[in-house]
């Protein structure tokens, strides 16, 4: 009879734990990314950017600031090691390289909405170009964007959000280098 009572106790404990974890899993997956980006009209942040080559050795560390508003309007400013500023009004991209004393103005034309921030904040671009999966680790929402095109499979984007603040973006740049941007002082809208 004692074994039976003990078995019931373990079984009941197991059921309670199972219910607890199934509720926890449900709450972990309740982060609605599309709702988040729909409400993200603008943001500003400081960042540290780390660029790595194929053998994962650090090539470059950069620091700067970003101010972003929907419709491809942004100011992305690198402060260290080189002072470079990218300014987009949604139609043109102006690049100012202070060290080279050079300004380049480009029409965004068909490349509109192809910058990293637009790729992860535009629902239509996400639906068209990526398969998206999200999961939670230590209270952080990790959103993984895998390109639908087979030749782009290496260009996976990873976005980390906690407490409605973007903490990190990781991606491959045009030179097949791994880039991680860690954000601080994130302010939205």
Show where each model-derived region lies.
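N-terminal leader/targeting segments and the immediate start of mature chains
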Residues: 21-62, 72
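Short hydrophobic/aromatic-rich beta-strand segments that constitute the beta-sheet cores
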Residues: 47, 74-78, 93-96, 145, ...
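Bacterial N-terminal signal peptides that target proteins for export
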Residues: 2-13
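Bacterial N-terminal signal peptides
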Residues: 13-20
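Flexible, surface-exposed loop/linker segments and immediately adjacent secondary-structure boundaries
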Residues: 100-140
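Short, surface-exposed coil-to-beta transition loops
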Residues: 61-63, 81-82, 152-156
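Gly/Pro-enriched, hydrophobic low-complexity segments
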Residues: 125-189
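An acidic-aromatic
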Residues: 65-114, 176-179
């Amino acid at each position: 009879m004692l074994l039976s009572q003990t078995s019931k106790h373990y079984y009941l404990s197991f059921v309670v734990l199972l219910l607890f974890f199934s509720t926890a899993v449900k709450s972990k997956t309740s982060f609605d990314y599309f709702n988040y980006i729909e409400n993200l009209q603008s943001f500003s942040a400081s960042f540290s950017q780390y660029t790595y080559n194929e053998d994962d050795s650090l090539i470059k560390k950069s620091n700067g600031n970003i101010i972003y508003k929907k419709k491809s309007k942004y100011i992305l400013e690198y402060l260290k090691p080189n002072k470079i500023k990218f300014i987009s009004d949604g139609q043109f991209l102006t690049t100012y390289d202070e060290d080279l004393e050079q300004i380049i103005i480009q029409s965004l034309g068909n490349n509109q909405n192809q910058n990293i921030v637009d790729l992860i904040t535009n629902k239509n671009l996400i639906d068209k170009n990526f398969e998206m999966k999200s999961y939670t680790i230590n209270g952080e929402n990790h959103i993984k964007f895998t390109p639908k095109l087979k030749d782009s499979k290496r260009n996976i984007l990873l976005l980390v959000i906690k407490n409605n603040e973007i903490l990190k973006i990781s991606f491959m740049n045009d030179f097949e280098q791994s880039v991680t941007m860690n954000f601080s002082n994130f302010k939205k809208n």
